[in-house]
């Protein structure tokens, strides 16, 4: 059995909830649809819900089984912001936290902090430095870790 098959079997045995903040990217959307169809993870697209659905329709990509967190939904943003502000790891004041609810990359990381997803996956549209900075700011570093590397 090859490495990729082993990894697929391990993922399918214990699917994680994964947030994808770059779902508007066609390559990412196709990958997320395939992951969901193969039940390798519970996929969560984070972005403009209407635009994600429109792009999926245009591209002929099924979003069946994929949760969408719509960053344009003001009511959902307010509820998420309230939860985040009460979390001990929140480093922002109310206005700063509210701004981050509408930014897919930061919202995905906040979902991770809140335990709504296990992990966030990005890097096709966002620069590595932006991802590291957002992750370090919102999620933070593990105890004993003081240096970040993208290698």
Set out the residue ranges of the language-model regions.
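Short beta-strand elements
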Residues: 149-151
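A glycine- and small-aliphatic-rich helix-loop capping segment at beta-alpha/alpha-beta transitions
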Residues: 127-147
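Contiguous, glycine/small-aliphatic-enriched amphipathic segments in soluble metabolic enzymes
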Residues: 1-128, 134
């Amino acid at each position: 059995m090859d490495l990729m098959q082993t990894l697929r079997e391990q993922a399918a045995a214990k699917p994680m909830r994964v947030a994808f903040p770059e779902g508007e990217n066609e390559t990412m959307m196709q990958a997320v649809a395939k992951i969901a169809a193969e039940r390798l993870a519970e996929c969560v697209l984070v972005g403009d819900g209407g635009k994600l659905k429109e792009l999926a329709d245009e591209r002929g990509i099924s979003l069946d089984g994929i949760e969408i967190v719509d960053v344009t939904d003001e009511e959902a943003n307010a509820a998420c912001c309230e939860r985040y502000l009460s979390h001990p790891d929140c480093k922002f004041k109310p206005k700063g936290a509210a701004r981050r609810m509408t930014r897919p990359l930061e919202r995905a990381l906040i979902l991770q902090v809140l335990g709504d997803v296990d992990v966030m996956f990005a890097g096709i549209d966002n620069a590595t430095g932006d991802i590291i900075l957002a992750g370090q700011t919102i999620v933070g570093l593990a105890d004993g870790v003081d240096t970040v590397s993208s290698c």
